[in-house]
């Protein structure tokens, strides 16, 4: 979230951002692994966001897992309070994957996947574990050499956190 503009410089500082951003990289069974997270939603929702990515050695497949976690007692109490405010419908969240403007993406397999055609002719497919809603939405691409943003698309996984641990698994493969 941005603060009110400074009265002299008109700059807007980022506030309420993450304070703790752990990152770890290493080897996975079939390639490389990245694990990271942040606590930006801790004070507002009691949730820590963690992400695990694995990339196969041949570069043809990437799997991911996003997690929203209420870990300690105070965090669980904060999450319970936010969950109660939703009348137990769940805390809404979106996971967004922004695509380059040159990627031609379409919803495929009856809404279970997104197929992406690259200019090179390669086809990549995004799939998820089926526990949340998958959609394709309009987005923008900011390019340093252009004065205006370019139209693009973004893959969006939408869901509701109902428990102290919410997991969303997805993959991107050729």
Language-model regions, residue ranges each:
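CBM-like, beta-strand-rich accessory domains located in the C-terminal region of large
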Residues: 1-174
């Amino acid at each position: 979230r941005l603060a009110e503009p400074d009265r002299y410089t008109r700059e807007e500082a980022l506030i309420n951002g993450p304070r703790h951003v752990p990152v770890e990289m290493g080897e996975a069974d079939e390639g490389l692994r990245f694990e990271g997270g942040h606590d930006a939603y801790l004070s507002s929702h009691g949730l820590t966001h963690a992400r695990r990515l694995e990339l196969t050695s041949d570069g043809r497949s990437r799997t991911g897992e996003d997690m929203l976690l209420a870990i300690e007692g105070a965090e669980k109490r904060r999450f319970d309070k936010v969950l109660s405010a939703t009348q137990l419908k769940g805390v809404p969240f979106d996971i967004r994957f922004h695509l380059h403007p040159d990627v031609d993406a379409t919803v495929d397999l009856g809404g279970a996947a997104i197929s992406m055609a690259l200019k090179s002719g390669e086809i990549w497919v995004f799939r998820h574990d089926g526990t949340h809603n998958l959609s394709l939405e309009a987005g923008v691409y900011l390019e340093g050499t252009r004065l205006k943003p370019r139209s693009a698309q973004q893959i969006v996984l939408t869901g509701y956190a109902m428990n102290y641990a919410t997991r969303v698994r997805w993959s991107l493969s050729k």
